[in-house]
């Protein structure tokens, strides 16, 4: 199974790239983690945010291969504990499809992305900087994988 993280924003700080790649490399070949970056629309004083969100949404959805299971990362989504995420990861594997996780920009996800998603995951009730979300998602998925494989990374 491949997990595709589709995120708005490019040119992240070095610590984000380093952190994400650290967890990305730990996954086995049969559980690949891929990052697809979508350029953020230009925001300014008079920016049309609805138009920017729409364009970002179109680009995100175009980056997702047909047949992928789509999960939006969104505040109204479900929160999962590590064991619950591990169970979810197992379900995704049994489903036989690759998974695309969507991370929006500063204003969140386009309505089209929310509608395309069959699940919505709330990473935290806290407001997190979008670059940090990439690292937290990668670590959380790795931890869930380690629970499922009895790897010593996760400790109760």
UniProtKB/Swiss-Prot annotation:
InterPro entries: Alpha/beta_knot_MTases, RlmH-like, tRNA_m1G_MTases_N. One of its GO terms (molecular function) is rRNA (pseudouridine-N3-)-methyltransferase activity. SUPFAM superfamilies: alpha/beta knot. It catalyses: pseudouridine(1915) in 23S rRNA + S-adenosyl-L-methionine = N(3)-methylpseudouridine(1915) in 23S rRNA + S-adenosyl-L-homocysteine + H(+). It is found in: Cytoplasm. GO terms for cellular component: cytoplasm. Its EC number is 2.1.1.177. Pfam families: SPOUT_MTase (PF02590). S-adenosyl-L-methionine binds at residues 73, 104, 123-128. Keywords: Cytoplasm, Methyltransferase, rRNA processing, S-adenosyl-L-methionine, Transferase. The keyword rRNA processing applies. Homodimer. Belongs to the RNA methyltransferase RlmH family. Specifically methylates the pseudouridine at position 1915 (m3Psi1915) in 23S rRNA. HAMAP family: 23SrRNA_methyltr_H (MF_00658). This is Ribosomal RNA large subunit methyltransferase H. It comes from Shewanella woodyi (strain ATCC 51908 / MS32). The lineage of its organism: Bacteria, Pseudomonadati, Pseudomonadota, Gammaproteobacteria, Alteromonadales.
